[in-house]
Amino acid sequence: MAKLTKQAFVEALKEMSLLEIKELVDGLKEEFGIDPSAVAVAAGPAAAAEVEEKTEFNVVLKSFGDKKIEVIKVTREVTGLGLVEAKKLVETADAVIKENAKKDEAEALKAKFEAAGAVVEIV
């Protein structure tokens, strides 16, 4: 028996009807013992994990830039901290300003801090 090339196989498939292709697939499943439910179960959770979207974010102050006083004012306004606590927080490297914020709240905080001259990251 001559070896069938991939290209010849594809050309042969192009000439088949959908019913013939279905019968071919069913025959291959039977010949090689392929269980379609096992394939679907294995692929199911991975597909669900890809769709899952993060809903809570942390707003992290990376740098106060050259407007430290403005950033301290915004920090006090957002967190409700006193002057000394807000100053310490601003001076801390990678300080978390807000934890578990919703996406739109985190974006609003980022915009507010950036307007004051800070470098902020949402993680």
UniProtKB/Swiss-Prot annotation:
Pfam family, one: Ribosomal_L12_N
A Gene Ontology term for the protein's cellular component: cytosolic large ribosomal subunit
This protein's record includes keyword Transcription regulation: no
GO molecular-function term, one example from the UniProt record: mRNA binding
One GO term (biological process): translation
Lineage of the species this protein comes from: Bacteria, Bacillati, Mycoplasmatota, Mollicutes, Acholeplasmatales
Keywords, comma-separated and alphabetical: Ribonucleoprotein, Ribosomal protein
Function: Forms part of the ribosomal stalk which helps the ribosome interact with GTP-bound translation factors. Is thus essential for accurate translation.
Family recorded in the similarity comment: Belongs to the bacterial ribosomal protein bL12 family.
Protein name listed in UniProt: Large ribosomal subunit protein bL12
InterPro entries assigned to the protein according to its UniProt record, in alphabetical order: Ribosomal_bL12 (IPR000206), Ribosomal_bL12_C (IPR013823), Ribosomal_bL12_C/ClpS-like (IPR014719), Ribosomal_bL12_oligo (IPR008932), Ribosomal_bL12_oligo_N_sf (IPR036235)
CDD domains attached to this UniProt entry: Ribosomal_L7_L12
HAMAP family recorded: Ribosomal_bL12 (MF_00368)
Gene3D superfamilies: 3.30.1390.10, Single helix bin
Oligomer and partners: Homodimer. Part of the ribosomal stalk of the 50S ribosomal subunit. Forms a multimeric L10(L12)X complex, where L10 forms an elongated spine to which 2 to 4 L12 dimers bind in a sequential fashion. Binds GTP-bound translation factors.
Name of the gene encoding the protein in the UniProt record: rplL
